[in-house]
């Protein structure tokens, strides 16, 4: 009998916030520890966005006490893009603003100004995150996993919305090229949250990939 476990990592959803900021290896260790504690010997892994990023790194772990048969990556993060000129300028402006507003006199006079500036520059996730999770997000988004993709040695299904702006379809094409035994399913006119926009179709594709069920 198959069992499905939905695992929410530290700092995500309603889970507890970590005491310190985490990096990709911390999340991988968290997953491995959980699987071992549950005494799971074989499993399939499904990850969306950062969940996919964690799976990519986990699949490159030297020694696992369990067997991963297949993986599904949905709009997976993990490929770092070169920053555009406008993005570089924004980062530069933010660093200058941060330096200026670190002066005590200005901090006392404008206590919330730096926070407002941060909110102008960050992504939606960054804006809504706590300070610890903001540090975590910075670590994660700057971790490029391209070099790990060719070492994934299990059948891999990639599911992507063609209109994904967070992890563009070009990322999916790159992963399909780099992961040896992989296939890409493009879902037309869907965003980063393709599994919410086309849940029945996505579920059917995953079931067929994992079990050969076409229902």
Provide a role label for each language-model segment.
Residues 53-61, 66-102:
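Flexible "cap/lid" loop of the alpha/beta hydrolase fold
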Residues 176-193:
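Catalytic histidine neighborhood in serine/cysteine hydrolases
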Residues 165-171:
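Conserved alpha/beta-hydrolase "acid-adjacent" motif
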Residues 190-203:
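Catalytic histidine-centered segment of alpha/beta-hydrolase-like enzymes
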Residues 84, 99-153:
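Conserved alpha/beta-hydrolase catalytic His-Asp/Glu region
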Residues 152, 158-160, 164:
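Short beta-strand/loop motif that positions the catalytic acidic residue
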Residues 5-46, 203-204:
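Active-site loop/oxyanion-hole signature of alpha/beta-hydrolase fold enzymes
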Residues 44, 69-72, 150:
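Residue in the alpha/beta-hydrolase core beta-strand immediately N-terminal to the catalytic nucleophile
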């Amino acid at each position: 009998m198959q069992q499905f476990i939905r695992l929410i990592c530290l700092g995500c959803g309603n889970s507890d916030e970590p005491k310190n900021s985490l990096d990709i290896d911390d999340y991988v260790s968290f997953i491995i520890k959980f699987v071992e504690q549950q005494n799971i010997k074989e499993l399939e892994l499904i990850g969306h966005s950062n969940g996919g990023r964690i799976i990519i790194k986990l699949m490159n772990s030297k020694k696992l006490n369990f067997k991963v048969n297949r993986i599904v990556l949905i709009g997976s993060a993990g490929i770092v893009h070169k920053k555009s000129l406008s993005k570089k300028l924004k980062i530069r402006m933010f660093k200058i603003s941060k330096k200026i507003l670190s002066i005590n006199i200005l901090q006392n006079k404008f206590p919330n100004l730096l926070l407002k500036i941060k909110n102008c520059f960050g992504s939606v996730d960054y804006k809504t995150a706590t300070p610890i999770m903001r540090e975590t997000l910075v670590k994660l988004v700057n971790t490029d996993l391209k070099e790990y993709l060719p070492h994934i040695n299990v059948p891999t299904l990639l599911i992507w919305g063609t209109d994904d702006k967070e992890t563009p379809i070009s990322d999916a094409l790159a992963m399909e090229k780099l992961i040896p035994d992989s296939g890409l399913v493009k879902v037309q006119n869907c965003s980063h949250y393709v599994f919410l926009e086309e849940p029945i179709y996505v579920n059917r594709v995953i079931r067929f990939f994992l079990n050969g069920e076409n229902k």
